[in-house]
C-alpha cells in the first residue's frame, strides 16, 4: 500500500462519525456528563416547552430541544400526541444532531426528558440516547457550571427509521390480558387508578386496565424535585412487586403518556422488554368494548 493511499484512507476514516470517548449507559451521572462536555460525539439536549427557561441557564454546550416539536396537542390542553418521524427527524437536525452521535437528554421537568427518551427510542435511536440522572436540578445541586450562552452549531444530518415494536395499541393489550408474561404497569396515582378521580379528562370509564398494577412514577425517583433514579435493587423490587418478573414484557401506560414515559425508561434500565401504550387511559377509558 502506498503512503499516499494510506493517507487518503486515514483521512476518510477520520471524516466518519466516531463513537463517544466512552460508551454511556441509558442513565448517565452529572460527573460523567461533565467529563464529556467537549466530546464531539456527545450531543446534550435541553428539553423544554419554553426556550426562555433554556436561555436563563443550561448545561454548557447543551442544544435546546423544543418539546413542541416532539409532541402536539391532539386534544386541547393535553399536548401529548407523538409527532411524525419526519417532524422529529427535522427537529433533531435543527438541533445539530447527526448520524453516529450519542444524545444525552435532560430537563428541569423529569417527564420531559423521559418523554424525549422514549420517543427517540421509538424513532430508532435505541442505544444512542441516554438520560441525565437527577436532571437539571441535580446538575445544579452537584455544583456544576451553568451557562447562558447558546452554542454555535451547523444543522445536523440524520435519517431516522422507526422501531415498530415499542408502541402498542388497545387491541394489542386486549389480546394479552390473560398472558402471565405481560405486566401492565399504571404510572398514575391512587385516585386515578381506582377511579376515585371520577374520570380525569372526560374519560367515560374511570379506573384502570384489568390486571394492571399501580406504580406511581414518582416512586421511581428520590422526589420529583430531586429526580435521581433509585438504585437498581430498589427499582427491581418495585417492578417485581408490580408483577414484572425476569423475562416478562412490561407495558407502561398512564393518562396520556407523560408519566408512563418515566416508567418506560425505568423498565428499560432494568433490562425488561418494554412496550409503551401511548393512547393510555385517555384511549382505553373511552372505549366501549
Each model region followed by its residue ranges:
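Hydrophobic h-region of N-terminal signal peptides that target proteins for export
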Residues: 8-18
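Mature N-terminal segment immediately following signal peptide/propeptide cleavage
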Residues: 22-49, 61-67
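Solvent-exposed loop/turn segments at secondary-structure junctions
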Residues: 49-52, 68-72, 109-112, 136-139, ...
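Helix-loop module immediately N-terminal to the HCX5R catalytic loop
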Residues: 72-99, 217-250
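Thiolate-centered catalytic microenvironments shared by cysteine-dependent enzyme domains
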Residues: 82-172, 176, 207, 259-282
